[in-house]
Amino acid sequence: MIGTSSLYQLLKITFFFYPYATVLKVGKVGVVVRIVDGAFGPVSLLFWLLGWKIPSKRVPSSNSCGLDTKSPAKNGAMSIKRSTPSITKYREKYFETILLLNALCFRVKILLCAIILLGFIQNSTIVCQ
């Protein structure tokens, strides 16, 4: 039987050392994401499969008005930016959710594998009741 203290230690180690992504700041400028991950970690692999670039600091958020504040027009007014493809809008909209769900799924998988492995080590066989 797995004790509560060993399960707590296992949970703490799993959540501390396994690759994860945290959202540092959500504001008008964008979503600041910190990825704690190796070069070939699960988050990077997911990004590679989806064809995304791994962000280092900022992920641009979609502007609801469609205004581009970075490049003003000649007369000083804001220029209207061109519409982006719908897939880009979905990437920007669900970027944070995909990262957090990905990190959560991998943590749960690692935790379950570690519990099963710990059960094998302690009992040498898992007894099904």
UniProtKB/Swiss-Prot annotation:
Q: Where are the transmembrane segments?
A: 35-55, 98-118
Task: Classify the source by domain of life.
Answer: Eukaryota
GO cellular component annotations of the record: membrane
Keywords (A to Z) from UniProt: Membrane, Transmembrane, Transmembrane helix
Please report the record's description of how this protein sits within the membrane. Answer: Multi-pass membrane protein
Give the principal location in a single coarse category.
membrane
Q: Where in the cell is it found?
A: Membrane
- Miscellaneous remark of the record: Partially overlaps FKS3.
Protein name as catalogued: Putative uncharacterized membrane protein YMR306C-A
Q: Which organism is it from?
A: Saccharomyces cerevisiae (strain ATCC 204508 / S288c) (Baker's yeast)
